[in-house]
């Protein structure tokens, strides 16, 4: 058996070697598969080093070879379709012994930096109203908040009321409008709980005790088992108050309820449904709205501070350009602009309502008669979980640029891919804090990326090895802006960018191969579309690499199976001896026993409900 194992293993490795290295296959053949398909290039991604193009194949252009005039230089020089267009040398802005070629790869140096502003990806749910997930409790489906990022400055306004939403819900004989959204008092107190109280409560929990205050608050709220259902995935949302460092668990997950059929703004009718809506208000500056899914590394992957001296833009072949189509509103300051962006941001609020939904008087009658079927739709239209279970998945007008000079707020729904350095602007998002600002613009980003790309290419073409004439070859990336104009390797004199706090220079004499359309889409220009037909994949050996990876994985699996088989045969006796010791098997590693489990009787004989929270809306009577 062991001989068979060795034979199979050697055969497998031989097979893998032939796929990867054998039969003289050249993996860099045909890097551009030309076609007539027109591809957008919004999604530029940096390729791993092993997938990058050899940007220097056949042609070399030295200084003495350039004899064209200025008008010819932008279009008429030969283009190496293997990946490089030579940069003209008349201006002699770099060493005469250097041969500079321009890469054809339109990479984006902002990719990593801007990842946290891809809100659809990093948050994945509504912002203004977050009801992006469903969970079952006692056989019934309910909607609940699910955003992965904190929403800074978000709170709930109860219309025509002085009651704050962080006040506990009405209980016992209290009128509905006497209560808010938070959990009622408990013994021991679980909400609100101070940061120090949570630290002490979870001091022996390795999974929770070292979390930051926002994530800790989210996990604390998530430890509550609704309706005594330990198998439910439903988790309550929470609000953390930075001012007093308290975590408030929200008993009501609904965030908006408007319209005469669903609520009553008349304060004199104390026991009628109150109207409410989400907002970023001055009163909520220190609040942060949290779902059960807030990631523990949110500080790295989610936006918090607004960006001073910055304007969101789109990366277009070597430079960051303005977003052409925006919605412009007046705003006196950054707070008002951030508030406007929030109001227009992604929302999971239902868009259609059931025709047969009863008005609030009938819902009130349901409270009076303790008829759960009449009141289960309270606090949001029934359509939210029957006729219309809308989920935005984070798509919306989530970004804005605030112009401090004109006091205009420019709001848009296209994912920004770079930042423009402009002293008049502040870039903001619907998730960001209403007033907190990051002051440090990454001025060295372009220079650092240019250096990194040149070094990366030099390793491939052995830049340090001089040719016969003592010349060096440099493959310059398609980055035409930098705070170091010498790093641009520009064939003309770079121009200084106005309103730039970084003193950026831009090279304008190299032909740009992409443009922005009127609908905010970045596309390759018509004359270059054949060369970039593979965009956004843009990996010449992508299909081959998939085959190689799959075959290598298959070989590894085969080898593992054989090794496990031999090991099992050798250790059969010991295995069965161990199986006689039940204490080694089936030991749970879960921490359900550590989760808070409030008794159902805590809420009284009747409980509250809505389609966003699994507990009935009937007021608890103590």
Swiss-Prot record:
Top-level taxon:
Eukaryota
The record's disulfide annotation reads: 149-302, 217-247, 263-275, 320-418, 337-409, 443-502, 490-507, 492-509
Sites carrying a glycan are 162, 286, 371, 421-422, 499
Looking up InterPro entries in the UniProt record yields: Apmem_Ag1, Apmem_Ag1_dom_sf
- Region: Disordered; residue ranges are 578-603
Q: Which residues form the signal peptide?
A: 1-24
Keyword tags: Disulfide bond, Glycoprotein, Malaria, Membrane, Signal, Transmembrane, Transmembrane helix
Per the record, ranges on the Extracellular side are 25-546
Q: How does it sit in the membrane?
A: Single-pass type I membrane protein
Cytoplasmic compartment residues: 568-622
Task: Give the family per the record.
Answer: Belongs to the apicomplexan parasites AMA1 family.
What is the protein's name according to its record?
Apical membrane antigen 1
């Amino acid at each position: 058996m062991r001989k068979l194992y060795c034979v199979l293993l050697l055969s497998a490795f031989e097979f893998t070697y032939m796929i990867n290295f054998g039969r003289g296959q050249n993996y860099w053949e045909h890097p551009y598969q030309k076609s007539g398909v027109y591809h957008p290039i919004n999604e530029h991604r940096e390729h791993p080093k092993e997938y990058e193009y050899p940007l220097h194949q056949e042609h070399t252009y030295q200084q003495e070879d350039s004899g064209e005039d200025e008008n010819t230089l932008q279009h008429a020089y030969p283009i190496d379709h293997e990946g490089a267009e030579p940069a003209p040398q008349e201006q002699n802005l770099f060493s005469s012994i250097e041969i500079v070629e321009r890469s054809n790869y339109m990479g984006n140096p902002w990719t990593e930096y801007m990842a946290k502003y891809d809100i659809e990806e990093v948050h994945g749910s509504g912002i203004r109203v977050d009801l992006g997930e469903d969970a079952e409790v006692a056989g019934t489906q309910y909607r609940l908040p699910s955003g992965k990022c904190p929403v800074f400055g978000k709170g709930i306004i109860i219309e025509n009321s002085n009651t704050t939403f962080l006040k506990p819900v009405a209980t016992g004989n209290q009128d509905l409008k006497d209560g808010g959204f938070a959990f009622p008092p408990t013994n021991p107190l679980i909400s609100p709980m101070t940061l120090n109280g949570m630290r002490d409560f979870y001091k022996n929990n390795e999974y929770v005790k070292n979390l930051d205050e926002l994530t800790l608050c989210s996990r604390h709220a998530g430890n509550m088992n609704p309706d005594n259902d330990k198998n439910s995935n439903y988790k309550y949302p929470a609000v953390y108050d930075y001012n007093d460092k308290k975590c408030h668990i929200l008993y009501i997950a609904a965030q908006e309820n408007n319209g005469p059929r669903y609520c009553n703004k008349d304060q004199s009718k104390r026991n009628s449904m109150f109207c409410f809506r989400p907002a970023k208000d001055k009163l909520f500056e220190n609040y942060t709205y949290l779902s059960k899914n807030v990631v523990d590394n949110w500080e790295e992957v989610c936006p918090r501070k607004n960006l001073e001296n910055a304007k969101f833009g789109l990366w277009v072949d070597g430079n960051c350009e303005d977003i052409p189509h925006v919605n412009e509103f007046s705003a006196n300051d950054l707070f008002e602009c951030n508030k406007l962006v929030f109001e227009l941001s992604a929302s999971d609020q239902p868009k259609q309502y059931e025709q047969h939904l009863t008005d609030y008087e009938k819902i009130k009658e349901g409270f009076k008669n303790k008829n759960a079927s009449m009141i289960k739709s309270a606090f949001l239209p029934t359509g939210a979980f029957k006729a219309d279970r809308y989920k935005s998945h984070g798509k919306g007008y989530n970004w804005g640029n605030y112009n401090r000079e004109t006091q205009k707020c420019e709001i848009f729904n296209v994912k920004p891919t770079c930042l423009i350095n402009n002293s008049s602007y502040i870039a903001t998002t619907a998730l960001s804090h209403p007033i907190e600002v990051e002051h440090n613009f990454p001025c060295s980003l372009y220079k650092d990326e240019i250096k990194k790309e040149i070094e990366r290419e030099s390793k491939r073409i052995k830049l340090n090895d001089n040719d016969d004439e003592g010349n060096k070859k440099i493959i310059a990336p398609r980055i035409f802006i930098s705070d170091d104009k010498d790093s641009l390797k520009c064939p003309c004199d770079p121009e200084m960018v106005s309103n730039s706090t970084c003193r950026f220079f831009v090279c304008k004499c190299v032909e740009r191969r992409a443009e922005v359309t009127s609908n905010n889409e970045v596309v390759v220009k018509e004359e270059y579309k054949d060369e970039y037909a593979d965009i956004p994949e843009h990996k010449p050996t992508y299909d081959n690499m998939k085959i190689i990876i799959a075959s290598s994985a298959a070989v590894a699996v085969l080898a593992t199976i054989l090794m496990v088989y031999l090991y099992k045969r050798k250790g059969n006796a010991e295995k069965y001896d161990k199986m006689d010791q039940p204490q080694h098997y089936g030991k749970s590693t879960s921490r359900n026993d550590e989760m808070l489990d409030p008794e159902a009787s805590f809420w009284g004989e009747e409980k509250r409900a809505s389609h966003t929270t699994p507990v009935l809306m009937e007021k608890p009577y103590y």
